[in-house]
């Protein structure tokens, strides 16, 4: 019995060390990023992982992020946004709270989805997006634009232009901007 306990203990230690090594290895390829947009009493926090292009085709029918399929909008864990104010996104209200962000990229337009469920990992065991459509709160379609400069690492930012703001996704030569307004609530 004592040998069994020792073997189980050693196995647990080995598995823990292997998991920590694997997690650090994965994170080094797509480091995590979090940022806060703060203005007055408005606070918006975004958390995501930033994969690199590394010479790959990113957005295409057979690209790393295929057209028409749900994408976790980053790598590793699910991307999320947290707000303490109501955000009016193309006429739809996103209440204060924490939401995962999912996208369905296409050549001309993207569907951007804010979802009340935020799983710890962005894909399931089948390698598919860990997205639960029944928890979708806001869905908007936005146009795709391009830039001449190639963006090597996936980037999300928030920019203010007048009274409006934009949640911006940049990668490769693709730029997607989701316009929104922070309401006073």
Range-by-range predicted roles:
Residues 38-66:
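Short extracytoplasmic
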Residues 33-40, 81, 85-88, 169:
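Short acidic-hydrophobic surface loop/beta-edge motif
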Residues 5-21:
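Hydrophobic membrane-insertion alpha-helices, especially the h-region
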Residues 121-163:
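Surface-exposed, gly/pro-biased binding rims or lids
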Residues 51, 86, 104-108, 115-119, ...:
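Solvent-exposed coil/turn segments that connect beta secondary-structure elements
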Residues 18-33:
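Aromatic-capped interface at the extracytoplasmic side
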Residues 157, 165-173:
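Short, exposed beta-strand-loop hairpins at the edges of beta-sheets
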Residues 73-125:
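Mid-length scaffold segments of soluble, non-membrane domains
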């Amino acid at each position: 019995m004592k040998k069994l306990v020792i073997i189980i203990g050693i196995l647990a230690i080995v598995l823990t060390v292997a998991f920590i090594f694997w997690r650090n290895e994965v994170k080094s390829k797509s480091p995590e990023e979090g940022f806060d947009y703060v203005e007055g009493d408005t606070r918006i926090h975004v958390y995501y992982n930033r994969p690199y292009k590394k010479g790959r085709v990113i957005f295409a029918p057979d690209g790393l992020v295929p057209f028409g399929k749900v994408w976790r909008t980053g790598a590793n864990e699910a991307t999320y946004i947290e707000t303490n104010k109501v955000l009016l996104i193309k006429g739809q209200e996103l209440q204060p709270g924490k939401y995962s962000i999912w996208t369905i990229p296409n050549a001309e337009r993207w569907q951007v989805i804010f979802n009340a469920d935020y799983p710890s990992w962005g894909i399931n065991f089948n390698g598919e997006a860990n997205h639960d459509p029944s928890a979708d709160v806001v869905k908007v379609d936005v146009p795709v634009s391009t830039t001449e400069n190639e963006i090597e690492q996936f980037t999300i930012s928030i920019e203010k232009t007048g009274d409006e703001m934009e949640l911006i996704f940049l990668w490769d030569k693709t730029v997607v901007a989701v316009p929104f307004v922070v309401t006073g609530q």
